[in-house]
Amino acid sequence: DQINFLFNRMESYSAHFGENIHSFYRVAPCEGGVEIDLGSSDLSHVKITAEGWSIVYRGSGTKFLRFKNMQALPLPAEGKGSIDDLNLLKKYFNTDWTSFILVIAWIVYIMLTPKIHSSNFVILALNAVAGSGKSLFTKILLLLIDPTAVGIRTFPQNKKAVGIAAKSSHVVAYDNMRRLSKFISDLLCQLATGGVLTDRKLYTDDGETLINVHVALILNGIHHYIEEPDLADRCLPINLEAINSTDRIPESELLNQFHNDRPVILRGIYQLASDVLKALPSVNPTHPVRMVEFSRTLAAVEAAKGIPVGTLQEEYARRLQDIKRDAVLSDPVMEAMVEFANRLPYDSEFSLRSDATEWTGTPTELLVALGDLNGKRYRYNKQFPDSAISLSKRLRVLEKDLLKEGIEVLFKRSKVRLITIRINT
């Protein structure tokens, strides 16, 4: 009781008279750039500005937090970094060169983005076939930015575990993601942009625990797993290629090679980060998207490395369009409507008030027609509307996306509600 009393007094005193100190994990803002905590026992930091990068041992006023699972980054190799340093990393990434450069740009962006209120993290979404080395790829990314004792994680079953992981890391990697529900998709968006998770306080009926969450994310999976356009909009999609059986090397051997190469690779990344900071004030995105700060980083990478203006930005924008389209088309209503429209000119089953390019009926008639498609597969899908009213609401949400697929939806009100499906050829 006396110990608790003393703790309470100390807490009260610090709340009223103590100084507020801003602390950071792994990456912190500083004048003209960032400082990166190497996590070593000598408390050394890497300071990156537009003038270059350097190791700081003493004199930094930046306060870093360290958690038990944090592991140290090695000291980068001495000297000025070059493109050859970055090329050392390519042998560990089974991707095409454009994807490789986009990943390098993502690494730089994450290293230059501390957890502050205004920052937004782009989610690295790896899509891979079996045998592409996606887990090793993910592990190496963590070892370059934010190594921890936990490493790659499986997605937890409760929000509290998600919050704890986010609070004690700069980057969290989730392995073998599958079809993500809307709840999980929204949660991942919240992690990337920053927010607050709530949970019931232990041993109480109405107490609430608040967990501030903000973290960079790496997701990987074999199948298409991003199904919400809002999540897709925040991602950098990267496809990994299968490794030929004749080219396979044991993971332990690859990791040994990587640990030898890591100081040189980090030197190259820190140098590129400095070059990006130098270029940022003079660039403007040619293909701005929702995550516009990442577009600016891509523009700065183009300027720093002599890549034709807009090359990386255009590729990023194109990939976003593809992943968003895949996400929209995975919606069961969207999928059913596309199938319905494709079959309409040829299938007498839909001859009710229709011609070759148009169908008109009530919402109930459309619900029945869509539900009967493909062996009634849609009707038994839990995500498919169970009433005509719900279907009408979903169609209004999907109206613009359907139009992009050449399907126009018109809503008419007379004595009865009517929906016209028109195919624009």
Task: Describe the predicted segments one by one.
Residues 146, 185-209:
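Conserved catalytic/switch belt of AAA+ P-loop NTPases
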Residues 171-192, 224-233:
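Conserved AAA+/SF3 P-loop NTPase catalytic/coupling segment centered on the Walker-B
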